[in-house]
From Swiss-Prot:
InterPro entries from the UniProt entry: ATP-grasp, ATP_grasp_subdomain_1, D-Ala_lig_Van_CS, D_ala_D_ala, Dala_Dala_lig_C, Dala_Dala_lig_N, PreATP-grasp_dom_sf
Signal peptide: none
Catalytic activity: 2 D-alanine + ATP = D-alanyl-D-alanine + ADP + phosphate + H(+)
EC numbers for this chain: 6.3.2.4
Protein name listed in UniProt: D-alanine--D-alanine ligase
UniProt-annotated binding residues for Mg(2+) 2: 296, 298
PANTHER family hit by this protein: D-ALANINE--D-ALANINE LIGASE, D-ALANINE--D-ALANINE LIGASE A
GO biological process: cell wall organization; peptidoglycan biosynthetic process; regulation of cell shape
Length: 332
């Protein structure tokens, strides 16, 4: 039986570096059950340096090889890559652009789709273009008196706002503001994470998530799951990933079939319209008035022990190894 050499690239050096390593563990465990694959795990650090799990310095070159610094180690030919990196440079599309440049097949969304989803401003423009309802917002491109005034006016009109770094993970550089005196300092903090900032109306709503993925040539949208935050406020980075998180998750949300079908319809429309590939987690709000709003799309969702994507996939009747095998074999 012929084997395929798979590069499992993780880390990235960004704010979600540690979470990426946990997700890589999940991939590694699943790939270990598939004997047709040889897997080399390589960590990318904040300085752009590559290192194997054994601590060997190496690099991915344009010939689709992992070349080792040690002179006595032969290059490792790469047939396929899994960019298990949350945030930069994975979900931003940067690493995918390099893979495309060197003609290396890879798992996950392509570069342009990744960029469009990761930038919250671009994503919301796409949602509106696809006629998918989303939260009211405005965006700012500099820290200035004008930006402070615009955000303050939004707070007055909407009662409460979220200020979010536009080009960061969903819970990174994200702050709720209820008081006008907090606007300037919070904007300044958000701008340290991104050149652009988005201001959204705070929505009183339930947080629902759908796993949308491809398997055996079909696009699947699971029934929505639900995240219930202990603070009844916001699904923070710590609540999302910490082992002692008090947030509760339900793989199947307690909602009507009508609402579930509508959410799945929107999710499929977003997946197809934005040309996503292989995997995504698409997050929605269900307001107190029963309105469904698309919140955001994660093109490489977390795969930690408490993450929703693998749980929803399994609940839908698919094993993660079979899902990986299907997509690896079907990717050119």
């Amino acid at each position: 039986m012929s084997t395929t050499n798979i590069l499992l690239l993780c880390g990235g050096g960004g704010d979600e570096h540690a979470i990426s390593l946990l997700s890589a563990n999940y991939f590694e465990t699943s790939l270990a059950t598939l004997p047709q694959f040889n897997v080399l795990r390589v960590e990318l650090d904040v300085n752009g340096h590559y290192r194997t799990a054994a601590g060997e310095s190496c690099e991915l070159n344009s010939r689709r090889q992992i070349r080792f610094d040690a002179d006595n180690r032969a290059p490792w030919e790469v047939d396929f890559a899994i960019p298990c990196i949350h945030g930069f440079p994975g979900e931003t599309g940067d690493i995918q652009s390099y893979f495309e440049l060197i003609n290396l097949p890879y798992f996950g969304c392509k570069a342009e789709a990744s960029r469009n989803c990761f930038n919250k401003i671009t994503a919301k423009m796409w949602f509106s273009a696809l006629n998918i309802p989303n939260t009211p917002y405005l965006f700012l491109n500099e820290m200035s008196d004008v930006s402070i005034e615009q955000a303050t006016n939004a707070l007055v009109n909407w009662g409460s706002i979220f200020v979010k770094a536009a080009s960061q993970g969903s819970s990174v550089g994200c702050y709720r503001i209820d008081n006008q005196e907090d606007v300037a300092s919070t904007l300044a903090q958000a701008f340290t994470y991104s050149d652009y900032v988005i201001v959204e109306k705070t929505i009183s709503a339930r947080e629902l998530e759908v796993a949308v993925y491809e398997i055996d040539g079909e696009i699947v949208a699971t029934v929505p799951g639900e995240v219930i935050c202990s603070s009844n406020n916001f699904y923070t980075f710590d609540e999302k990933y910490a082992a002692n998180s008090k947030a509760q998750t339900q793989v199947v949300a307690d909602i009507s079939k009508e609402v579930s079908d509508l959410i799945r319809q929107y999710a499929i429309s977003a997946f197809k319209g934005m040309k996503l590939r292989h995997l995504s987690r698409i997050d929605f709000f269900l307001t107190d008035d029963g309105e469904v709003l698309l919140n955001e799309i994660n093109t490489f969702p977390g795969l930690t022990p408490i993450s929703m994507f693998p749980k929803m996939l399994q609940n839908h009747g698919h094993s993660f190894p079979d899902y990986l095998l299907s997509n690896i074999n079907s990717t050119d």
